[in-house]
Amino acid sequence: MKKLLFFTLVICFLMTGCGNDKAATEVTETISATAVTEQAVSKIYPLPDTTMNQLTDAILSISLEEGDAYVDDTGKMQMDLTLYSYDQYDMVDISMLKVGDILVTHTGEVEVAALDRKENGTILINGGLDENGFDLITNETGVYYECGYSDVKNWHEIGEATIRVSVDFMYYDTSDLDKGEILYYPGDFLIGAVTDYNFTPHNTTIRVENGQIIEMHRVYTP
């Protein structure tokens, strides 16, 4: 009788141990599945913006207002400029973008709830522009960026800079299709010959060489 009782206790102990092992296994599997799900969601960040580190030789998108062009105390002409850039994404990162991922922009994070890749390379995020989402397009360098209607980039301010104006500076204004191209020189900013100060990152760029502005271009925008 004692032997029977002993074997019964042993069997119960073993069964209890097996049950605990099974429960532990189930918990482990649940945690692992959750971890895998979390890892599957990727955050896509814009490429680092180096504009402010390359002001001596660059093409810059700018804005300026009346009075921002002047002659300083040393007799050199300067321009006080506001500089702009836009979010750019690596093509490899975008090629792996999927529903559920997070796209990081300069304004915050966007969860990708819908993704539609077009044959022309355009990618519609969350329905695209027509459904309050946005469009990503690529350029000749292979990077992707957000594009609005009429191919307008989503510019945002990144800083301010004062840059010297070259004595050989020329400003080409083609913003009025009826007037055609108008050419201005440095002094035109100082004597009031330049009267239209609608300079925005959408229509105005400058070219800087060796730390001096040698050209400004303002183009027509619809």
For each predicted feature, which ranges?
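Solvent-exposed hydroxyl-ligand-binding patches built from regularly spaced Ser/Thr
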Residues: 31-222
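C-terminal motif of bacterial Sec signal peptides marking the signal peptidase cleavage site
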Residues: 14-17
